[in-house]
Amino acid sequence: MPSTPAVVLHDLTFSWPDGATPIAGVSGAFTAGRTGLVGLNGTGKSTLLRLVAGRLAPTTGAVAVTGTTDYLPQRVTLDTDATVADLLGVRRVIDAVRAIADGDFRPELFDVVGADGWDLEERAVAALAAADVLAGSPAGSPGGGVLDRRVGTLSGGEAVLTAVTGVRLRGADVALLDEPTNNLDGAARERLHELVRTWRGALVVVSHDRELLELVDSTAELRTGSLTTFGGTYGQYEEWVAVQQEAARSALRDAEQTLRREKRQRIETQERIAHSERQGRKDAADRKYVEAVINDRRNAAQKSQGSRRGAAADAEARARAAVATAGRAVRDDDRIVVDLPDPDVPAGRRLAVLRGTDGRETVLAGPVRVALTGPNGVGKTTLLEQLVGAGAPGPDVVGSVGAGSDGVTRASAQRLTDRVGYLPQRLDGLDDAATVLDEVRRGAPHVPPGELRNRLARFLVRGDQVDRPVRTLSGGERFRVALTGVLLADPPAQLLVLDEPTNNLDLASTDQLVQALSFYRGGLMVVSHDRGFLDRIGLTAELALGTGGALTEVAR
């Protein structure tokens, strides 16, 4: 396995202007192989990538990189006015080549093109074709082809895969990918997995995609200000951590047992000393000994008792410190255990109707769990938005299949209940100025604050977190607050609709989402490309949405 360090971190610290310090004194290295970078949301993984990429400057410490870096941020779809060429990172060179072709022979343009840039436009189009992305786009003359398409016209998955294709095209020495599988459908994920599988330089990938993390040479975990690197896949790392944690829990049990023993010995010592003191006072009262002897014995006893008290206290203090040290080595294994309100969804209760362009209807009834799958760009999110945003529900009303404003015929959906909880891909509906408690109270205004705090604690939102402004939360924390608000709504949602819920969630948060959903007793409809997640939530059906708007039930 490659062992040459491509990135070296030395006592790296970074603080934001408000004083928050996500990276504090981190040292370590990434080798020339493929490294999966994991860690809880909010531990600073994205910040660390930006520091390595040179997008941020360390507050103290240093980052040393061998060769060039290429950085793919987590959010690549925000600049909707950018072009595909911008997303690929080739716009400047292509513009220079086009200007020269139009008769502009300024020397600086030739410097931009260099020796290898003359055919970059053709190579970029070929790379997109090889990645099977934007296959339906025109790739004709310069200025009107696929490279000039606006990012705003791409689906989220198309934008991500285009950016990943740019990483391959540019071929930097060190590639840094931040959650690259977000919004990718199954085929696009396979393409990304192939990129990782065949990468020849140093590659550091932040991801919660377990399948991708099984392709790496090393796993690095950023946790509580330290970077732990393990020479193996994430699955192997999990097994190693499990062994280490069992040993740590055993050490903690031993330390706690020692502390209990030292406490007992201290108490017994105090009792013996107290008995001796009582006996001494009795002897003095009985004038059993002459006063000089009594004073000598009292002084000797006080010295001995002080020494014994000190020794017992020191032994207990050492045992208590050992417990604290052993406790720090044991990870919190927080699990969501909640008793959610009953949404009252009997088996025959109709919740929604979906209709494909072929005229087939699918009725969601009772506590069903349905996955809506399909390639990027077919309209899964649009269908969910119609489902939760359609007009007043009725028992026999179904949205009509027809052409949208863009002339594309799509499937339709209609909710048959007012009690729908919806978590979109982008959690834009959260009030950033509100506290977590106030945000959750919006959906449950009649629940007393004290009871709501208790419920939040069951969702692992505890203590000071409840009073934090929403704007200070990480992506995973924002999602957990949004999920908590939906699941604790009063009255409870009868149908829960989730659009790519595992995007931006770390592996532990995904586990907690699965746990929370296991307590939900209503109907569930979820769009996700995360096959591992879908396999864990007890699906009762899967519907595939095709490019023509047809809905097909997938055999399970």
Q: Which residue ranges define each predicted feature?
A:
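ABC ATPase nucleotide-binding domain signature region
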Residues: 31-35, 46-110, 367-450, 529-532, ...
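GG-anchored amphipathic helix commonly corresponding to the ABC/SMC/Rad50 NBD signature/C-loop
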Residues: 156-176, 388-389, 477-497
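Hydrophobic anchor residue at the start of the ABC signature
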Residues: 164, 192, 483, 502, ...
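Catalytic Walker B motif of ABC-type/P-loop ATPase nucleotide-binding domains
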Residues: 175-179, 184, 495-500, 505-506
